[in-house]
Amino acid sequence: MTLKIGVIGTGAIGQDHTRRINQVLAGARVAALNDVNRANAEACQRDHAPEARIFDDPHALIRDAEVDAILVCSWGQTHEEYVLAAIAAGKPCFCEKPLATTAEGARRIVEAEEAAGKRLVQVGFMRRYDPGYVALKKAVAEVTGAPLMVHAAHRNPRVGENYLTPMAIHDTLIHEIDVLRWLLDDDYVGARVLFPRKSPRAHEKLRDPQVVVLETARGVVIDVEVFVNCHYGYDIQCEIVGEDGIARLPEPMGIQTRSGAVLGQPILMDWKDRFIDSYDYELADFLKAAARGTAAGPTAWDGYVAAVTADACVAAQEAGGESVAIELPARPALYA
């Protein structure tokens, strides 16, 4: 059986996922498209899914009997509405981050999924599928001993004028918030944000770089450098210091050169190139589970925890270096 997918939101990531499903992965095809700008949906249909129908109403797409599962790739403010509609229709749903723009909205999705009695939602935290992070998690389990500290960095070449200080948390750090919690299998209990001297490349309304310090329930201390105007490349670093050793995220594969008395290796400039395989792996996981009428991978609960943690980090940006508590309710049995 070929799984029929409906894609809501055909901007850059929606079009890329449509291409991925129809041209790279097996067992599914994109059967329906929707975008607030119909021209985007028509372009996606023309370039990647000529047999797909275009829906002007996203809710009609979700309800359609010829659509088996949903991809929500639209503007973040709409995610909660469409994910809740997919749950109500009993259809597996892959939602790009954020699951919702507020912790309260993410909690409503968790509650709806609990009421449905089974997992239907996968959140697009693709780093869990990156081979480097998978190997790092294995090293933590088998080599380093219990984690003590984590040093991490998320560096972008540059950002636009519309990128503001809180976006360093909600748009950038959010990936570390999820993947570090997954690596450590530990929840956060507190967050602090420190601001070093401001980079002259940062625009007036952006404080950059930032250092976010997270503490976990087991006492692990994590420092994450967020530097979104580093200019030299897209650079993701992660080092876990354990009781018995240290494990470090490997660099992306690249040709090493020796020339002119210089040992060199290129640094990627684009996040899509850094994690291109991870997107294939995460969607393949979703399609495999959706064919069984369920969901796999990062859960709605993971999306909720990320939202609560991000809110605390944004509050910590205004707390003058003081720690802000991160408080979570008990994890529902559905996500145990």
Swiss-Prot record:
GO biological process: inositol catabolic process
Molecular function terms from GO: inositol 2-dehydrogenase (NAD+) activity; nucleotide binding
EC number(s) from the headed UniProt entry: 1.1.1.18
Pfam families: GFO_IDH_MocA, GFO_IDH_MocA_C
InterPro entries xrefs: Gfo-Idh-MocA_inositol_DH, Gfo/Idh/MocA-like_OxRdtase_C, Gfo/Idh/MocA-like_OxRdtase_N, MI/DCI_dehydrogenase, NAD(P)-bd_dom_sf
Domain of life assignment: Bacteria
Keywords: NAD, Oxidoreductase
Catalytic activity reported: myo-inositol + NAD(+) = scyllo-inosose + NADH + H(+)
Keyword NAD applies: yes
Similarity comment text for this entry: Belongs to the Gfo/Idh/MocA family.
Known role: Involved in the oxidation of myo-inositol (MI) to 2-keto-myo-inositol (2KMI or 2-inosose).
Oligomeric form and interacting partners: Homotetramer.
HAMAP family recorded: IolG (MF_01671)
Protein name: Inositol 2-dehydrogenase
Organism listed in the record: Paracoccus denitrificans (strain Pd 1222)
